[in-house]
Amino acid sequence: MRALVQRVTSASVRVDGDEVGRITPPAGGHGLLVLVGVTHTDDEAKAALLAKKVWTMRILENEQSASDLDAPVLVASQFTLMADTRRGRRPSWSAAAPRPVAEPLVDEFTGALRELGATVETGVFGEHMEISLVNDGPVTLLIDV
């Protein structure tokens, strides 16, 4: 599994013009926008490990984690994170898991974050989403497990 994690001062996601998720940390605070990609060999253990890593990664103020600050998290699935761009000019999507594999694992990741104590908002799996964010820093990390 792969997560693109961004430290944000706000983030929201819209589907068909309707807002389906939003995080607004307290004034001066941060939250995390997490885009999640799943490959064929991923499983529930990897989803739980990725959730723990994201929740405890020390990328917020004063080298603290989202866990330390109860920072909100917005999660959206993004199969394009699994693109292979090493050859030619057209990305290959063959490493991205199909929906029957990926959707339950994104749900497992989100559930694991909630079990760890996170306040989590989500996008809608498989839908075209418009994501708005204010990336602070910028701080953007790619995490693979």
UniProtKB/Swiss-Prot annotation:
Q: Which InterPro entries match?
A: Daa-tRNA_deacyls_DTD, DTD-like_sf
Please classify the protein's predominant subcellular localization into one broad category. cytoplasm
* Domain-level remarks: A Gly-cisPro motif from one monomer fits into the active site of the other monomer to allow specific chiral rejection of L-amino acids.
Motif: Gly-cisPro motif, important for rejection of L-amino acids; annotated at: 137-138
Q: Does the keyword tRNA-binding apply?
A: yes
Question: Which lineage?
Answer: Bacteria, Bacillati, Actinomycetota, Actinomycetes, Mycobacteriales
- Gene name, per UniProt, is dtd
The UniProt keywords, alphabetically, are:
Cytoplasm, Hydrolase, RNA-binding, tRNA-binding
What is the protein named?
Answer: D-aminoacyl-tRNA deacylase
List the source organism: Rhodococcus jostii (strain RHA1)
Q: What Pfam families does its record include?
A: Tyr_Deacylase (PF02580)
Oligomeric state and interaction partners are given as: Homodimer.
